[in-house]
Amino acid sequence: MSPSTITLLFLLFAVIMFVLEKIPLGVTSMIVCIGLVVTGVLDVKTAFAGFIDSNVILFVSMFIVGGALFETGMANKIGGIVTKFAKTERMLIIAIMVIVGVMSGVLSNTGTAAVLIPVVIGIAAKSGYKRSRLLMPLVFAAAMGGNLSLIGAPGNLIAQSALQEIDMKFGFFEYAIVGLPILIAGILFYATIGYRLLPNHDVKDEGAFDTEKDFSNVPVWKQWLSLIILVLTLLAMIFEDKIGIKLCISGGIGALLLIITGVISEKDALKSIDLKTIFLFGGTLSLAAALQETGAGELIAGKVIGALGENPSPYVLTFVVFILCAVLTNFMSNTATTALMVPICLSIAQGMGADPRAVLMACVIGGSCAYATPIGMPANTMVVGAGGYKFMDYVKSGFPLIIIATVVSMIILPIAFPFFP
């Protein structure tokens, strides 16, 4: 059996097990990860590279930074301030999505989610609303906000690099032509109808995320220092390019400072790390690597696009590229999906004599629609434990958002980015 066939079988297995959830998501990920090594598809180093991925380091760091915000009671304090202004659950959802969406446009969407997850859990605790109903809109807004600027998500820069090789480019805010209407439509959806689809779980955490602790004995300096370090970490992430320090390192410095200064103990810091998230993310990265290395991902893309024939309608091609990227991104990382599809889309556009910017915009926006699974993008994975989510929660809440993004994109793309200008 060829490596690509084995990879596709593992992909099918993962999808089935993620949907059924007969065994924990993290265990399924590890079965796939180890299975790819045992079958010889990947070597050990490649299969387990996901566990030293920069996003895993960012996860661990921000779990500790978030843990400190809880341990000191500062998350509850912030939650109290926000809930004074947002009186209803729907107002809270709108406020969270607007703040996260805008921040995600200039920050990494993963970084934005990592910083604000503990704050939102604090808001949930203070307001009495269930965190499972607030965290999912947060990560969806982070994904949508990534399409507001050139630096909002890695996939945006991948497409830009490909265009620069043929002396073309996207403007800094050009993605927002499609991205901003999608963000507005998404917020309106969850404010009116979509909030009914959000999961309604009672989640009780232990350790650093226990929001019902008595914080009266916590020194005030610890509360403020936890917030100051969070803000400094956030600023370091915003100015990542200027200071030359990667997101994960900024997070690591913040986490270390909190432990060294005694704001959070080593024991509580370790307790705040959600290992379920680490195993789920690290394990599924091996599947993404196998899809790329064996050519299985390219095979899927090639078969679908090849079925359209030699001279497909530009509108049909835009739709197919968008949907294909939207499907792939929910099982591979959104960055890997864009990296896989950009060269394929570019060659098709050039073969048709079409404007490559139109096809690549569809590719990037479709590749950002990682709403329907917990593994589509790192932020989705980060809230699995905190929100008590199951695989089908993402499908139920996120799939309508893919439909909305598709409809909005199919209206705007042919107008703003015509194939034959």
What is each of the regions a protein language model found here?
Residues 1-60, 64, 177-302, 318, ...:
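Hydrophobic transmembrane alpha-helices of multi-pass small-molecule transporters
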Residues 21, 40, 73, 128, ...:
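Glycine-centered helix-boundary capping/hinge motifs
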Residues 145, 232, 257-258, 267-270, ...:
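Generic hydrophobic alpha-helical scaffold/packing signal
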Residues 13, 27, 32-34, 38-130, ...:
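Membrane-embedded alpha-helical segments and adjacent helix-loop junctions characteristic
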Residues 14-23, 99-108, 140-151, 236-242, ...:
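Transmembrane alpha-helix interface/packing and boundary motifs in multi-pass membrane proteins
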Residues 44, 90, 131, 172, ...:
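Alpha-helix N-cap/start motif
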Residues 6, 91, 127-140, 146-158, ...:
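Juxtamembrane and boundary regions of transmembrane helices in multi-pass small-molecule transporters
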